[in-house]
């Protein structure tokens, strides 16, 4: 009888232990669920993705662009010969006095499938996309929807930092925010910007120039917040569609997939494909694909005052060393003494633009290399454009 009582007590203790263990496990799971970092939550389609899916439901691939090249023009013949002899792998577009004079592909868009680069090949423009973000920002300024001197926290109240960050400092890359570290865990722009806010400011870099993708990701989020529209929708409704940039698309737009160049780099075993696996978080700073002709078309139309009035356009394109534009860099591009320049490099692709009032030269490659050497030779030595263009300290009307 005594043995049975002991047995019952043991069974009861075991049962109680099991119940308590189950309760503790359940509590831990509940706590873990509620304490998941919002940066790493599972997400559905982002606003950008939703907009692009809807936009492309009935969209077909754009019409093909023809090759433009006049072998009877000595300078363009020389450019063509130079690109071939230097084993250039990419595409070139050159506008002269507002007209397309050269558009040609070299090498391969996709080495594995043997698909050649053509005027239709669209390249990942990387940081050259900051130019588009800068244009959207400038438009919102002119519409009096933002003040470039306001702190970012005015537009994103949750973006709290140890020191105030004006939008202007983001635009000029002098916010002091720690350099953005991309992660495969971030699945959209929101998660990227929350990660940027969480890392905060490096006090040693505050108010000092430090190029940082994070600055333009935050600006992209500000643009979304102010307009109530996704970055992609802002781009298309305010730039892409009005200026008829039909050979430009975001990285995940299905109708354009067959035209997107693959990026490569040489390593010890030969040519290696660099898979762009973090573009979902790069709205505003590096997930746009363009043909060189579309970029040239964009710049030409800005020069022709189709986006801003002369009063806005001329200082924007030409001033530096002035109160309004103290630095060469502004709104995603550089105004330098002999030219204006924008550039981006991402996942083996490099997209570079040199331009003045006479020429717009766009050179895009998809095998990682020094694009600057080639475009300098074309612009300075063949087209003979190494001469004064913008003057420091001069206010332009």
Curated annotation (Swiss-Prot):
GO function term, MF aspect, one: hydrolase activity
Keyword Ubl conjugation: no
Catalytic reaction annotation: [(4-D-Ala)-(2-GlcNAc)-Rib-ol-P]n-[Gro-P]m-beta-D-ManNAc-(1->4)-alpha-D-GlcNAc-P-peptidoglycan + n H2O = [(2-GlcNAc)-Rib-ol-P]n-[Gro-P]m-beta-D-ManNAc-(1->4)-alpha-D-GlcNAc-P-peptidoglycan + n D-alanine
Documented EC number(s): 3.1.1.103
InterPro entries reported in the protein's UniProt record: Bact_CellWall_Synth/Modif, Beta-lactam-related, Beta-lactam/transpept-like
GO cellular-component term (any): plasma membrane
Signal peptide positions on this chain: 1-23
Record's miscellaneous remark: Inactivation of fmtA results in reduction of the methicillin resistance and in a modification of the cell wall structure.
Protein name per UniProt: Teichoic acid D-alanine hydrolase
Organism lineage string: Bacteria, Bacillati, Bacillota, Bacilli, Bacillales
């Amino acid at each position: 009888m005594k043995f049975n009582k002991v047995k019952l007590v043991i069974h009861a203790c075991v049962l109680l232990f099991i119940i308590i263990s189950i309760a503790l496990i359940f509590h831990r799971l509940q706590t873990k669920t509620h304490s998941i970092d919002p940066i790493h939550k599972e997400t559905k389609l982002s606003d950008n993705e939703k907009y692009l899916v809807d936009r492309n439901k009935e969209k077909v691939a754009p019409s093909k662009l023809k090759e433009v090249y006049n072998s009877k023009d000595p300078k363009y013949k020389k450019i063509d010969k130079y690109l071939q002899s230097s084993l250039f792998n990419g595409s070139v577009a050159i506008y002269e006095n507002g007209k397309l004079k050269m558009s040609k592909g070299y090498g391969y868009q996709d080495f594995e499938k043997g698909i050649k680069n053509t005027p239709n090949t669209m390249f990942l423009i990387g940081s050259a996309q900051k130019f588009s973000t800068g244009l959207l920002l400038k438009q919102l300024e002119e519409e009096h929807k933002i003040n470039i001197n306001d702190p970012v926290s005015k537009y994103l109240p949750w973006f709290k930092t140890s020191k105030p960050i004006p939008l202007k400092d983001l635009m000029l890359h002098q916010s002091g925010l720690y350099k953005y570290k991309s992660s495969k865990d971030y699945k959209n722009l929101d998660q990227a910007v929350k990660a940027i806010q969480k890392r905060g400011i490096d006090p040693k870099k505050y108010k000092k120039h430090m190029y940082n993708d994070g600055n333009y990701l935050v600006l992209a989020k500000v643009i979304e917040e102010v307009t109530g529209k996704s970055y992609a929708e802002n781009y298309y409704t305010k730039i892409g569609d009005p200026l008829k940039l039909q050979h430009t698309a975001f990285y995940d737009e299905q109708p354009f997939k067959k035209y997107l160049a693959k990026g490569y780099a040489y390593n010890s075993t030969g040519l290696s494909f660099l898979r762009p696996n973090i573009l979902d978080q790069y709205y505003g700073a590096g997930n746009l694909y363009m043909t060189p002709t579309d970029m040239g078309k964009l710049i030409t139309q800005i020069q022709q005052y189709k986006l801003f009035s002369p009063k806005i356009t001329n200082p924007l394109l030409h001033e530096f060393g002035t109160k309004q534009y103290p630095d060469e860099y502004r709104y995603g591009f550089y105004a330098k003494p002999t030219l204006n320049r924008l550039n981006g490099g991402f996942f083996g692709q490099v997209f570079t633009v040199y331009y003045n009032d006479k020429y717009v030269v766009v050179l895009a490659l998809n095998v990682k290399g020094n694009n600057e050497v080639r475009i300098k030779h074309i612009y300075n030595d063949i087209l003979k454009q190494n001469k004064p263009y913008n003057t420091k300290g001069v206010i332009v009307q």
